[in-house]
Amino acid sequence: MRVRIATRASPLARWQADHVAGLLRSADPDLDVEVVALSTEGDRRTDVPLSEIGGKGVFATEVQAALLDGRADVAVHSAKDLPARTPDGLVIAAVPERGDVRDALVGCRLVDLPTDDVVATGSARRRVQLAHLRPDLRFEDLRGNMATRIARSERDDVDAVVVAAVALHRLGLADRLTDVLPATLMVPQVAQGALAVECRSDDAALRELLAGIEHAASRRAVDAERAFLSELGGDCTLPAGAHATILPTDDDAGPAASAGPVASGVLSIDTQGTGTADM
């Protein structure tokens, strides 16, 4: 069986696609797996804020188009970049085991930043929460791949940049992490640290294959967080975060807890339920 995996062309996206390819080969050594790297508008236009070109959804749209028109069989995304609603004809067929959900600083620890220091981030969610924690800081926009972001932290006009900790772990750059922020302090982006593996909804054979790399607890947490985002009527650009965890009392039932900040001030919500509908 041949499986073509569509992904963005960035080093992190390629790592993620190669990781899923490895999981599939482990599940079925006879598979012929090919990674198809695509350039997306979000990757090409790093000179403008994401909000001006359609938000984080621009990273997913062109990769999803490759699925819908038959150029690829599977798409691998950072789950945090996906809008809350999946396009008609596609399905998130697998969520592999999730990585680190936390945000992190490169360049300086949060508590050590002096008043009026500059923190670079392209995320409204991160900016809102950091401004709530440290209203004395200043913020600048940040775009580009991880190498660009790390380089930005070394410039004289920026004192720290905010990244997803998991990205540096996956790229072998964990030694550049200066301050990893607990999820209780800095609520992560919905589905941060998770991968979403999409395929066409009518491809029964491929859906069965992808079910073999599913991680049940990660899926339940990601589904709960995405349901939270959907209820807010937002997409992945909404300045709201959520972190769901499977409570140890009854793992099979999938109870979870979540919290989320929103941009008009910071509103934090903690809740518990037995499924995404309760969240």
Feature map (PLM): residue ranges:
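A conserved helix-loop-strand patch within extracytoplasmic ligand-binding domains
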Residues: 79-82, 88-137
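Short, Asp-centered acidic motifs that coordinate Mg2+ and/or phosphate
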Residues: 72-76, 118, 159-160
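Small-molecule-sensing regulatory modules
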Residues: 1-39, 45-48, 52, 136-279
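Short, structured active-site "lid" loops
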Residues: 47-74
